[in-house]
Amino acid sequence: MHFWKYCGAGNDFVILENFDGSIAPERYAALAAALCREHFSVGADGLMVLEPPAQGGDCRMRFYNRDGSTAEMCGNGARCLCRHCHDRGLASGPVQRIETPAGLVTGRRIAADRYRIRLNRPSVVRLHVEAEGVRCAYLELGEPGIPHAVVLTELDRPRAE
């Protein structure tokens, strides 16, 4: 079995190409848990399995966390996957088009080691909440594949020096 390991913004990912279907999808979760196990294997934050596209993309990606659970998509992983597609000649043009359960993710090489991706637009909920004594002025709940929350506090506001 051939695989590649990439690092993006501090996250490590293992990439498997399964374009020929030689690996049964039922094995993906167990492979993720085995390959991503730190200190006893390759070690990674997640496994991305590439399959033939189903809806006009360059490939379809299935993402598995290190414990074998699934996620719709991962932004840092998608950037690594764009690099992989570029380096392996898997993209049909200058833009890499990756099908994910969260929707189509597109990426473009902007420098030798830099890739920019376009994610789905997150949903936004503006709230004023207090969390453990910190008053938050803004909370964004987005789901670009894996649920995320961004909290800006008074400390995050720009200040003049």
Label each region the model flagged.
Residues 1-112, 142, 152-161:
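A glycine-rich beta-to-alpha transition motif near the start of alpha/beta enzyme domains, typified by
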Residues 113-120:
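Short, solvent-exposed secondary-structure boundary/capping segments
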Residues 123:
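Ligand-binding beta-strand-loop-alpha-helix segment within the catalytic cores
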Residues 126-141, 149-161:
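Anionic-ligand binding region
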